[in-house]
Amino acid sequence: MHSHHSHSGDYSAHGTDPLDSVVDQVVNLNFHTYCLTEHIPRIEAKFIYPEEQSLGKNPEEVITKLETSFKNFMSHAQEIKTRYADRPDVRTKFIIGMEIESCDMAHIEYAKRLMKENNDILKFCVGSVHHVNGIPIDFDQQQWYNSLHSFNDNLKHFLLSYFQSQYEMLINIKPLVVGHFDLYKLFLPNDMLVNQKSGNCNEETGVPVASLDVISEWPEIYDAVVRNLQFIDSYGGAIEINTSALRKRLEEPYPSKTLCNLVKKHCGSRFVLSDDAHGVAQVGVCYDKVKKYIVDVLQLEYICYLEESQSPENLLTVKRLPISQFVNDPFWANI
């Protein structure tokens, strides 16, 4: 079993447990591959989260501490990887990466620099979008609304901006794993009224957004998604199926069935699995539910995972695991 995206309380302000405790749980559950991928630091004051304000007396001090924390993560993760590399009683292989912050071009360039300067440790990145129009969309409901308000409460324009930001991240970074592809749905209210033609919200002519498939409702959105997936396919990237959406009470993981069908059509059906854990209790979270999603709903023939070569360069390759082997993995006996 695999997870390609994880965090801990040591290096994330919204994490809950030490990295070593998370790793202990990973080993106890008998994962095959587990990727350690803390967030890169945000390097501008306006992107510091409220929970991080207490890290320093001023924004500059907070940013310095975030940068130091990320350096500490790389050292710690390398020690963990080495610790378990030659243990015959542990089958888990740890791969070290990072989750990028694509708030703006400055952060995209910073991510590229981090990867280049630390390529002996960081083997890949999870490419994610957490901000739309510079406003976080996964922090809380009010911030999500603030982002929507910045588009004059037009959901279509909001989504177009999300997928354009994703595209800019993709063409500049070419992340091997693309994270929570439809994160925008986390705080999207099911009962919000949307005009099907214009995308304007809360109009009397609107219908509940839950009754719409927002990807196929507007051709501009559909085309942007297909463009992004075709670009990911062009360099061999993979889309993560992320169970944190199920943990947060959404009906489907990231991405939705509609998007997954487009991945099958335009991106070689390259899916990897992630728990996006931020603590011990979230390791392998909702994997029983996602197994049904993968096998019964998506009817995938295989699931992909990353494997690190034993060459001097330690390059990563995307491997395929047939679904028949996936459903019979020893991991399932432990959850």
Swiss-Prot record:
Its EC number is 3.1.3.15. GO terms for cellular component: cytoplasm. InterPro entries: Histidinol_P_phosphatase_HisJ, PHP_dom, Pol/histidinol_Pase-like. Signal peptide: none annotated. The lineage of its organism: Eukaryota, Fungi, Dikarya, Ascomycota, Saccharomycotina. It comes from Saccharomyces cerevisiae (strain ATCC 204508 / S288c) (Baker's yeast). It catalyses: L-histidinol phosphate + H2O = L-histidinol + phosphate. Keywords: Amino-acid biosynthesis, Histidine biosynthesis, Hydrolase. Gene3D superfamilies: Metal-dependent hydrolases (3.20.20.140). One of its GO terms (biological process) is L-histidine biosynthetic process. It comes from the Eukaryota. This is Histidinol-phosphatase. One of its GO terms (molecular function) is histidinol-phosphatase activity.
